[in-house]
């Protein structure tokens, strides 16, 4: 504890039609990291006479901290996350910037996409967190509660292991949220996270509906705090939270729970985020999530420079930014985009849109939604042409979809539009557009995941299910449930231990490899077999080809692609054999994957001549395979190009 003498200039009051701005001195008894409601003031007589209630005074000067949500920046922009080597390069630059108390390092949409890229997420998290820890920066992860790090429910024993593993790897804070705001899906995680030594930050998924009121959110916050939550995050995942409500919610939580740290997470898509940040800070928020260029703004997050400038000029105590380090982090992020991550980024995610306010869909899913909409549009227009009706443009379809989401959302119980329930709600609306065009009506094409949300298998939706859907469920023999979702699952770790033992796989440090298999079984198996890396490199090459092909002719694209590559030419006529058996037991022989590395003089392939001899074809000067022109078993003539290998950089 310490006393600090402070002078605040912007003390604003309003009483009737009279307003005043006063300067005064006061002492505050400051306890480190406590919110303002813990400070006791001793103002001058004029101020004390004017204000009987300190809450009527707008106090400027509260300390605000910032988190860099680097993981979510990438998730909201595209498909993949930076590799371990890239994260290790940029982490010290975040430290050098000097303005971040926290960095979001991992969690949902990090570990899984690492595996999809053929990378080990455990190694990445450990290496990434280390320099941040050494500098005193706290690390945090995204945690989907019942679904943990994936899109469907996870057994209790796997969820418990997750917190032990992630804390051992260097993650300090877990941000636990549930897409339905069902506290039953969050409360067990609070206990397990704290037992593992982590800070349990629980999230309120913010949206706008007649159900999602101030009272609704404060009740959930009370329940989570009573269950042991250390912090509260206002997770404004679509950026549609109204600033006034967010300010009132922040104040309501702080008034009742002054020790609780409040962190605000918003997206910039609909354009409300800066106003929301100002409101929550003026009402007691402690930490604000921010981004950096070139991935800030659009449908992602506000940039730290703008947020810090706004709050500083409002009178808050904020850190300075080392702009040289900011520009270094900006350049490195752009380098990562240019190297490969940009091929999986949808350009539309850089565009803000007020249309998001109407439907409430999160910005991060707009890219995939537009792709889905394009496919449905073609089918709908074929139907309309047969009926002699005008075709619909993409803009027409977008307005129709947003209107249908507004129709569907209340009827399925107002689930907060966040993963995975935003996808389910959007898909119901999309299928409705198609079936209505076919003359079949609504709610005809719904899969098990959509019904699971409606029936309560993932938790309780906030609102009432429409009677039409209740009746439809009865007709189809479906049953509603109010059971606690996590009690419907059986423990699974023993089965995964058995699988690892049978394969001769190590459990890994702190059982981290066992955890990855249990959390992402299919992706982990593909990672271990090498298939994930093959698939990823093929997808990357296809994305590069598509981007290049959109700008130039096929001939120009080929010339550009082959500029740094050596053509592997057949010296004889014959049949191509890339290999004589597959890469693994019982796998058929096939051509290699795009991206495979060769050293100078390595055997590249074989050609069986018409006279029965096998000609060994070397890999020229070596490098990376970028194109295959002859499949396994095809016939080639002398002089035909078999493939291209890109030479390594000098």
Language model region names:
Residues 216-220, 271-283:
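Catalytic cores of alpha/beta
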Residues 236, 285-300:
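Glycine-rich phosphate-binding active-site loops on the catalytic face of alpha/beta enzymes
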Residues 552-606, 613-618, 622, 627:
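Acidic, low-complexity mobile loops and tails
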């Amino acid at each position: 504890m310490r006393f600090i003498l402070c002078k605040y200039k912007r003390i604003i009051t309003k009483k009737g039609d009279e307003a005043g701005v006063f300067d005064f001195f006061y002492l505050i008894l400051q306890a480190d990291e406590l919110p303002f409601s813990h400070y006791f003031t001793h103002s001058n007589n004029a101020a004390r006479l004017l204000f009987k209630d300190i809450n009527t005074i707008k106090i400027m000067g509260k300390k605000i901290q910032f988190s860099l949500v680097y993981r979510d920046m990438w998730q909201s922009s595209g498909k993949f996350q930076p590799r371990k080597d890239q994260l290790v390069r940029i982490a010290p630059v975040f430290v050098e910037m000097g303005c971040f108390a926290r960095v979001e390092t991992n969690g949902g949409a990090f570990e899984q996409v690492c595996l999809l890229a053929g990378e080990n997420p455990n190694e990445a998290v450990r290496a990434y967190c280390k320099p941040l820890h050494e500098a005193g920066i706290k690390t945090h992860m995204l945690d989907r509660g019942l679904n943990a790090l994936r899109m469907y429910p996870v057994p209790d024993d796997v969820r418990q292991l997750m917190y032990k593993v992630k804390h051992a790897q260097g993650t300090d804070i877990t941000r636990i949220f549930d897409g339905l705001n069902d506290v039953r899906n969050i409360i067990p995680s609070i206990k397990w996270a704290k037992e593992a030594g982590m800070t349990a930050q629980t999230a309120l998924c913010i949206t706008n509906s007649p159900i999602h009121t101030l009272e609704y959110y404060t009740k959930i916050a009370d329940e989570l705090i009573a269950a042991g939550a250390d912090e509260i995050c206002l997770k404004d995942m679509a950026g549609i939270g109204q600033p006034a409500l967010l300010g009132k919610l922040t104040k309501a939580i702080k008034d009742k729970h002054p020790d609780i740290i409040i962190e605000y997470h918003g997206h910039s898509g609909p354009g409300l985020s800066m106003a929301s940040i100002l409101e929550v800070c003026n009402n007691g928020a402690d930490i604000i999530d921010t981004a950096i260029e070139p991935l800030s703004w659009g449908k992602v997050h506000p940039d730290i420079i703008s947020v810090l400038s706004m709050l500083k000029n409002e009178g808050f105590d904020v850190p300075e930014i080392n702009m040289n380090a900011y520009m270094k982090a900006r350049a490195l992020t752009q380098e990562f985009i240019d190297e490969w991550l940009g091929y999986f980024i949808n350009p539309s995610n850089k565009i803000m849109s007020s249309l998001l306010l109407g439907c409430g869909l999160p910005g991060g899913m707009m890219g995939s939604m537009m792709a889905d909409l394009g496919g449905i549009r073609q089918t709908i227009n074929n139907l309309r042409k047969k009926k002699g009706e005008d075709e619909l443009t993409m803009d027409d379809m977008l307005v129709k979809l947003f209107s249908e989401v507004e129709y569907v959302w209340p009827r399925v119980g107002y689930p907060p539009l966040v993963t995975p329930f935003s996808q389910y709600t959007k898909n119901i609306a999309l299928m409705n557009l198609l079936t209505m065009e076919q003359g079949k009506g609504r709610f005809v094409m719904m899969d098990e995941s959509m019904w699971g949300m409606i029936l309560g298998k993932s938790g309780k939706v906030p609102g009432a299910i429409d009677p039409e859907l209740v009746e439809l469920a009865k007709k189809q023999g479906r049953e509603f449930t109010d059971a606690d979702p996590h009690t419907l699952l059986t423990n699974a770790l023993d089965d995964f231990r058995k699988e690892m033992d049978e394969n001769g796989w190590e459990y890994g440090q702190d059982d981290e490899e066992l955890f990855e298999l249990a959390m992402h079984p299919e992706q982990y198996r593909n990672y271990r077999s090498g298939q994930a890396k093959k698939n990823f490199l093929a997808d990357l090459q296809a994305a590069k080809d598509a981007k290049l092909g959109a700008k130039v002719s096929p001939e120009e694209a080929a010339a550009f692609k082959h500029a740094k590559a050596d053509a592997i030419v057949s010296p004889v006529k014959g049949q191509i054999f890339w290999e004589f058996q597959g890469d693994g037991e019982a796998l058929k022989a096939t051509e290699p994957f795009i991206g495979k590395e060769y050293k100078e003089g390595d055997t590249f392939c074989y050609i069986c001549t018409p006279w029965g001899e096998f000609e060994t074809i070397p890999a020229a000067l070596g490098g990376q395979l970028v194109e295959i022109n002859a499949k396994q078993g095809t016939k080639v003539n002398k002089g035909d190009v078999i493939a291209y290998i890109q030479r390594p950089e000098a």
